[in-house]
A protein has these predicted regions:
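A short, N-terminal "cap"/entry segment at the start of jelly-roll beta-barrel domains
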Residues: 1-23, 103-104
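Short, charged/polar surface micro-motifs in flexible loops or helix N-caps
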Residues: 19-22, 32-35, 54, 98-101
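A generic "binding-loop/recognition-motif" signal
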Residues: 35, 43-44, 62, 78-79, ...
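Short beta-strand His + acidic residue motifs that chelate non-heme Fe in jelly-roll/DSBH
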Residues: 38-39, 57-58, 74, 80-87
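A short hydrophobic beta-strand segment most commonly corresponding to one strand
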Residues: 28, 47, 73, 87-103
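Short, conserved beta-strand element in jelly-roll/cupin
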Residues: 28-32, 41-59, 95
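Conserved short histidine dyad/triad with adjacent acidic residue
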Residues: 11-12, 27-42, 76
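Short acidic-glycine-tyrosine-enriched beta hairpin
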Residues: 61-76
Length: 104
């Protein structure tokens, strides 16, 4: 799935409603070097686990460095964006409450 407002970012649903998941959905993001996700907000929280690469989590709370093994919590209604600042793809897992449109 590609996302409006993103550059070099791809999202793939790993576990969703189609798998019978009623409470949470698990998504995988890959952001190319120099790429970013949309700068956006939504009414639900989500949790991030960084798998590979390096980047910056841009948010109202201030910019945070992202590296493999880091975890990040994004509060509901918080403006946020993930930027790849490294030389290899930035990959992370994102958990969101279900049901939600996978592009949100």
């Amino acid at each position: 799935v590609t996302m409006p407002g993103a550059h070099g970012a791809k999202m793939r649903m790993l576990i969703g409603s189609q798998d019978g998941a009623r409470n949470f959905h698990m998504r995988h993001f890959e952001v190319a070097p120099g790429g970013y996700t949309p700068h956006h907000q939504h009414d639900y929280e989500h949790e991030i686990l960084v798998l590979r690469g390096a980047g910056t989590a841009v948010s109202e709370q201030g910019d945070r460095v992202m590296r493999a093994g880091d975890v990040i919590w994004v509060a509901p209604n918080e403006m946020h964006q993930f930027r790849n600042t490294g030389d290899e793809p930035l990959e992370f897992i994102c958990l969101i409450p279900a049901p939600r449109d996978c592009s949100q």
